[in-house]
Amino acid sequence: MSNLDVIEKNARENHVPVMLEDGMEFLVQYIREHEEIVNILEIGTAVGLSSMKMAEIRETIHIDTLEVNEEMYKQAVNNIKENHLENQITVHLCDGALYHTDKIYDLIFVDAAKSQYKNYVEHFYDNTKTGSKFVFDNLNFHGIVDNPDLTHNRSTKQLVGKIKKFREWIQNEPRFKTVFYREIGDGIAISEKL
């Protein structure tokens, strides 16, 4: 078992919010097939698993990854160092909505506060170019977005409503061409900047 496999196993056993396995495989394969993807911004580091898997695709890939939780941040930094990927991955301890940079990214992977997805698009829009992609995870939210009766929790219903509203917005947003992959992971969308 590789070191990344151990990190992934521990994360899943401890309910750390990491991407579902088939969703991660899909994202890695997508980046592998698109060699123009070199500069990546990840919003939501957790323990650094997805960053490390993306960095392993090509040595030319550089990732800025943002994590708001200090414990997760420390664990991610440690995991990245242990896997000798600190030259490719820079972890920033901050809220994604407060991060500012002049960098232009080929891909922005959004896997953070679901209710803030639209704000992240607007906040980082100028950090992209024509052809850059936004990748969004958790757009099904465990199947509840399409079947809201699966929960009776009021705050979950509100969150699901925001995710549904975001899905409709990004699908119809004329600045992007969006493709949904509802059957992969917990629902993924890729929005390409036009």
Where are these regions (language model features)?
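A short alpha-helical cap/connector motif
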Residues: M1-L107, K114-K133, L139-L194
